[in-house]
Each structure stands twice: as C-alpha cells, then as structure tokens.
Amino acid sequence: MTILTHTLGFPRVGLRRELKKAQESYWAGNATREELLAVGRELRARHWQQQKQAGIDLLPVGDFAWYDHVLTTSLLLGNVPARHQNNDGSVDIDTLFRIGRGRAPTGEPAAAAEMTKWFNTNYHYMVPEFSKGQQFRLTWTQLLEEVDEALALGHKIKPVLLGPVTYLWLGKVKGEPFDRLTLLKDILPVYQHVLAELAKRGIEWVQIDEPALVLELPQAWLDAFKLAYDALAGQVKLLLTTYFEGVTPNLNTIIALPVQGLHVDLIHGKDDVSELHQRLPADWLLSAGLINGRNVWRADLPEKYAQINDIVGKRALWVSSSCSLLHSPIDLSVETRLDAEVKSWFAFALQKCGELALLRDALNSGDTAAVTEWSAPIQARRHSTRVHNVGVEKRLAAITAQDSQRENPYEVRAEAQRARFKLPAWPTTTIGSFPQTTEIRGLRLDFKKGNLDANHYRTGIAEHIRQAIIEQERLGLDVLVHGEAERNDMVEYFGEHLDGFVFTQNGWVQSYGSRCVKPPVVIGDISRPAPITVEWAKYAQSLTDKPVKGMLTGPVTILCWSFPREDVTRETIAKQIALALRDEVADLEAAGIGIIQIDEPALREGLPLRRSDWDAYLAWGVEAFRINAAAAKDETQIHTHMCYCEFNDIMDSIAALDADVITIETSRSDMELLESFEAFDYPNEIGPGVYDIHSPNVPSVEWIEALLKKAAQRIPAQRLWVNPDCGLKTRGWPETRAALANMVKAAHNLRQAE
C-alpha cells in the first residue's frame, strides 16, 4: 500500500499578503469585485501548484476563504443574519463582508457577527447565529466553483468541508433560547446536496473537519455524530478530520461512524499510533498528522519515521500536517535576512510540504538517508549558545511565592490610587493604540530600511505622540495613552527588544479577515537587555498633567502570539518573559508613570482544549502575570486588557490576576460578558468596552449610554470605567474622533445624572 501526502489546508493570504491588499482595496472602493475575485483565483492556482511541486499528492480545495472558513460555511448553508440579508434573499461576497465588518445592505451600520478564537489558536472566526425554526439551503457555491477550478487545472484534489456537528458547536443561539443541536437535522440535507455535487464531479475523498471531536463533549453532542454521519454516508469517501488534540477519549464514538478514514493530530495529541491501528476498523485509512502545522520548527524526521513505521504496509496510510498550514508562514526561502544558523532550524508551509514528501519517500522505500540529513540542524541546535542563557535560568529557578505578591490587597491599593489620581466617576480612557496612519507606517518603514536616520525617526515619532496627547486632551479623556506610534505590533515590538527572539521579513499569518500578523519566534532563553517603553512613556507624560498609561504586553500573550520553542515548556517561556517585563514595570514606575497596563488578551485562548487540563495552565498563567505586575507599589495602578473572551469558566483566575482595573471586550455581546463578573462578585474595577473597534461604525451617545446603564445594573457604577473594546490601531482618525467624542459625552451625561 503506497503512502500518500496531503495537507489539511494552506495559507491563503499570499506570500506578499496579496489577499489582504485586494480585500482592503475592494472595501475602499478602489477595486472592482471582478478584480478581487481574480486575485483569489490567482492565489489558489499558485498555492495548488506550489504544494504539488513540493511533493503533495492530494491537494486541499475549499480551504480558501474570503474572511474565515466558518463564515464561508455559514453562507454555504444560507445562514445569514436578517440584518445583513439582501432583500431578495440572495447571497454574494458583499453579504459575507457585511457579516464580518458590520453593515446592512443599505450601507447603514448593522452589528457585525461576534468574533472569537478558533479553538486555542490565534486565528479568529465569525460566530454563527442560530434561531428557533431556522431554515437552511445551499446558497453559496464557492466550494463547488473552486473544485471546478482545481479539476480544470488537472490537479488530484481532496475537497475540505467544516463538519456539521462542529459547525453547530461553534455557534450561538440568538433570540428565544433553544438547543441548537436540534438544527442538525435541518442542515444535513445541505451537506448531502454538497456531497452529491462533489460525487458528480468524480471526487473520491472529502476531508470533513470535526475538530470538536477532540473536546470533552456532552453525551448528546457525541451521539449527534452518529446521526450526522449515518445521513452523510455513501456518496463519497469521508476522511473524518480532527486536530489540536488527540482523539483517544472519544475513539469509541469515532469508530462507530460510517466513514472511510480518520485524520489525527500526532503533534498536539497524545494518541498512540499502535493503539489507533489496533482499534480503527481494518479497512479505514489513517491520516497521520506528523508535521506541526502551528509552528515554524524543522521536523525531526527520523523521529517521525520511527513513530509511524511499525504500521506501514498494515493499513492504508497517508502522512499530513497536524492541522491546516494556515497557521504557518508560507515560504522560508524568501527570508534573506535570517542568520544562516537560525534559518536552518526552521520550516514554513512549503518546507513542511517538502518534509511530508521526504517522510513519504522514506516510509515507502525504507531508505532513511534523506530524512536523517534533513534533520541534522536539529541536533546542532540542542547545543547552541544562542539557545541557553545561564543567568536567565538561574533567575527563574530562584523565584519565590513573594515574587508574585503585590505589597497590599486591592482595597488598600485602591485607596492609595484614588488619593493619587482623583479621577471622576465613569473615568474615560482608551486601550492603548491610536490609528496607524500611512505617515506613521511610512516613518517606521523608512527607518527600518535605513532611509531615515535615528534622529529624524525619533523626531517624527515624538510628534505623533504629541499629537495623540493633544487629541485626547481635546476630547476630554481622563486617562491618556501615548498612542503606540513606534509599535508595529503589540507582540513583535516587545520581541524586538528582548533577547531570545528572532523576526522574519515575510512570516505573515492570517488572524482574521484581512488582518495578518508576523509572530516573532522564541529561539532561546529570554531577557531584557535595556528598558523598552520607558522613554516614550516618560515623554508623553511630560506633555500633560493627566495620567498617561504605560503600555506592556503581558507574558502569556507574548507567548501565545509567538512561535514558541519546543524544547522547554510553555510555562518556562512565560515566566522568563514575566521576569523581563517585571523590570520594565519597575523602570516605568521610577520614571513617574503611575498607571501601567499589562495586556493579556490571550490568557483564555491559551487554555488547553480539555477542561481537565485547565487548572495547571491557569496556575502558571496567573503566576506569570503576577510576577510581571508585583514590582509595582500600592499607589501604582495596574490595568489589564482582555478580548474575545468567555469569562464564566475562568473567573477565579481572572480575579487571581489581582489587576486593579480590567478592561474587556463586551460590545458585540451586548454586555452579556459582564454576567460572569456579576455572578462572581468581582471585587476590582472593570472597563466594559462600549463600542466595537473592529467595525468602522461610529456609536451614538445614546447607544453608549444604554450599554453603560446596562453595565451598571451588574457592576456598581463606582467601579466602572468607560473605554472602547480594544485598541484603535486599525481605525481611521475621523471615526476615532467621532466615536471617542460620543464616548466621553456619554460618560459626562451619566456623571451629571448622578
């Protein structure tokens, strides 16, 4: 039985972020719909050809998405919220963008769908909305059109579909409460229709993604898989695809399904290959996810060979990435500035395809010479002085419980802070960043390219900071920020100033919609050679009598939004970062900065997928934050910010952070996230976000007042702050001014009403 290679998906954005640029040009009215669609066709054709040339036997089709693949599935099923629907019920690409960006067909503002993290990754999806009695029908044929494209190009393909049970699991009920699982029988006919259309096209295998099968699911949801796949069986061969964890706990459910193959993630799961082989039906294909789709490290191919070789020839076998390569940059070969030694440690999406081909050839032939040669740099790295820093390791080993304790409890600190800052009721602030204008980005780019000397660069950044302070004082905000003009990304900026990180030129990965990030890579022990934020924070504070927040990205977020080392634990990395940033807190405080924000938007996303594994993660995640913050004196107010979060199940840990103020993203959920804080009786101060910064819509004063009044029904008004949902980096100045003016006005109105 010959082993084949396949991938579960490939990066969509293009090596030069062509998709992002085309989307934003279209949204700005500078490109036609056909021009946008042409970019998509070009990218798909290029990516299929690149994978094929790299050695992939069966190409994924349907992994491309204009915004995210869950939203694509919603359109496929005709699941369009009423506020975004065309009058005639038709669906087009503008419908998709309206759901993601918040517009009605008339062009008027309409709340965007809620956005949240895709399992425990830094990718996002638009949450499907379900209502009682909802109808579904095939309305969006993107998958079928792309299958036709790939077949016309002569490729051997494997269409990709998000499975029906996972799709329902990822959604939320809107309106009258009901069990959304009851909709399964209503969406299955659409899936049957799609599979029938694929069968007509001669498709043999369909990859149907059910990552919910790695979770600890209620029994009713486990039972739903049998109902679903009994209905879907028979038209094509189904490769039931899981990832991000192992399947062994739910294997009894899986082996009862009428599918023809199973993909398992052998990187992030603890499944034993021999046990899987013994328990799976003998005629099933096993797709082994042996190459990490979520990191950038070169694979130890001899180890992968040994992991799978015992079952070669005993059952049908494919080798694949652990998950979609969506989470990896595209091509290492264009990284011309990386040090040669460090570069030899990495593999991006195309190189991972090559690794799969090497592994396939070795398994088919029994000749391991090529895989051994490929993995030689891994052995060298284990002894590199660039990886190990004895001073950092000693400091980490010396941590005591006292290092994670503030001097006094919140009640004592709050009194000292009130006396120091004398803020009004309903204090107003922003989350940190202001619009990153073309001028700001150009300034940074010119400096990075060497076209601008340091003095001119610093003068330019100082002027943008000065303007940000002027804007905030003009608006009447109470606690100011410097605007972060010097920062391209909240994680990359800190990584650039910490030892132990390296950066790529083109290592972009998609976060959501058109937003891409370029995560740093943790290659060694982490330390802070010099202060990072102090100079600009001190300068901003010198321009105003109002408090200016120092802005730090927290240790867990830096960890989660970087590509981490794989030779030490995530806990070790987080605590190394915490110690480095603890010194930054002390330096900011010494420079006269009285309010310091330590952003931890990724705390929840780092949770293991199985609840039984949560406690250990939360214990070290909270400890890392507290180590970072505990250098602050009582009168220094520590803020933290979180977004895209469901807090109900981690409230103990949120409280254990012991931040003086937490700001959270709540506007898209209509303040429902505050229910968690109310039920828990959260003791510290809270800033519930009052408008959605991911949408260009400007909220009215009345809208903001209504949200704040709703918040005050759950949290005492004296402990409430007023702020946007998130940073304003991606917005333009006109809507930023308008939105903040309305926010400040709403706060003033509420003060006057008291």
Curated annotation (Swiss-Prot):
Biological-process GO terms, alphabetical: methionine biosynthetic process; methylation
NCBIfam families: met_syn_B12ind, PRK05222.1
Name used for this protein in its record: 5-methyltetrahydropteroyltriglutamate--homocysteine methyltransferase
Coiled coil regions, renumbered to chain: none
Residues that bind Zn(2+): 641, 643, 665, 726
Organism: Salmonella arizonae (strain ATCC BAA-731 / CDC346-86 / RSK2980)
Reactions catalysed, as given in the entry: 5-methyltetrahydropteroyltri-L-glutamate + L-homocysteine = tetrahydropteroyltri-L-glutamate + L-methionine
Cofactor remark from the record: Binds 1 zinc ion per subunit.
Amino acids binding L-methionine: 431-433, 484, 599
Protein EC: 2.1.1.14
Entry annotation: catalytic residues: 694
Positions with a binding annotation for 5-methyltetrahydropteroyltri-L-glutamate: 17-20, 117, 515-516, 561, 605
Record's function text: Catalyzes the transfer of a methyl group from 5-methyltetrahydrofolate to homocysteine resulting in methionine formation.
CDD domains named in the record: CIMS_C_terminal_like, CIMS_N_terminal_like
